[in-house]
Amino acid sequence: FYQGKTITLIVGAGAGGMGDIRARALASVLATHIPGKPTIVFEYMPGAGGRKSANHFFNSVRPDGLTLLRVSSSIVPYAVLGEKGVKYDIDKLNYLGTTEHRLYYMFFTRKEAGLNSLDKLRAANGVRIGSSPVGHTGYIQSRIVAYLLDMKAPKIIPGYEGQDLDVAIGRGEVDGRVATTGTAVQMDLLNKGTADFHTSIEIPRGFKDDRFVHLGLPDIEQFAKSPKEKRLLAMMRGFRAVGTILMLPPGTPKDLVEIMKAAVEKTHADPVFHKEYKKLTGGDDPSPLSPDEQAQVVKELPRDPETVALFKKFAGTDTLPSR
């Protein structure tokens, strides 16, 4: 079927960013594993956190197997949380897996703050936690961590972008933050001894970064006191574990979906892909999730009204709820 054909890969982000780079690392090898070795060309459709491209893909793209979409995982929480502007159904998409789904976050405070134990962290009043803008992943994670650790009147300070938060930590503008291990390595926190680490967020549950295992950090779920709080964490983890999504539109013939699934799995297992991914991303290793596994993550997300309402409280600016 694909002999002599051209596949259009829509990227739900701008050209040149990390989303584009990762898509190119995948596409360059994927084309060699699709029977017929079609040509893959790129289109870019940034906007509305991925909703613009997802809406277009769901409603306007012909399901002929010749158009793919690679888009941020954020389209899933937008749908589950009932956000405005969602004109697609996440349960009708043909998921083709992701090149990255494992993440290990840590909550740490700067050494100068003197919060070198959970008892001291809980006793301190108004600890300043820097985060990304309101509603973003880092903001939500910061509020959930502060809530589950029973911190006293924590001050979540949003609005930081990129390395601005690293600088703010260094200057003492904020006392702590939630960060990936990649950020912690970049800041050289272990070698410099400039941070106290308190808890981790494993995505998926059970995943640990070998570089930080020796710290023995408890996963944040150890601080959950009720099934409600565990569902909240399952939602938070699931939204991230979905990873960046590669998909075919609903209505695509099943045989073409299966051809593409098989090609993606062969790509994920190909050493050439791993080498290309690491080269283009500046040293990152891929952590692939198969098409069926990705679809299962979406299927298992908590969607009950109570959990949705609770999660939205952490995404907003209201005072943290009582436990």
Q: Which role fits each region the language model picked out?
A:
Residues L69-I75, E161-G162, V178-V185, I201-P204, ...:
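Beta->alpha turn/N-cap motifs
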Residues P271, L289-R323:
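Extracellular/periplasmic bilobal clamshell ligand-binding domains
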Residues Q186-H268, E306-A309, T317-R323:
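C-terminal lobe and pocket-closing loops
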Residues K37-N55:
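Early extracytoplasmic/lumenal segment of secretory-pathway proteins
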Residues A195, E202-D209, I220, E265, ...:
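Mature extracytoplasmic/periplasmic domains
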Residues F1-I10:
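Mature N-terminal segment immediately following signal peptide/propeptide cleavage
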Residues I7, T32-K37, H56-T67, V76-R171, ...:
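Hinge/capping helix and adjacent helix->loop/strand transition within the periplasmic-binding protein
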Residues L9-R24, P46-G49, G130-T137:
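Extracytoplasmic "Venus flytrap"
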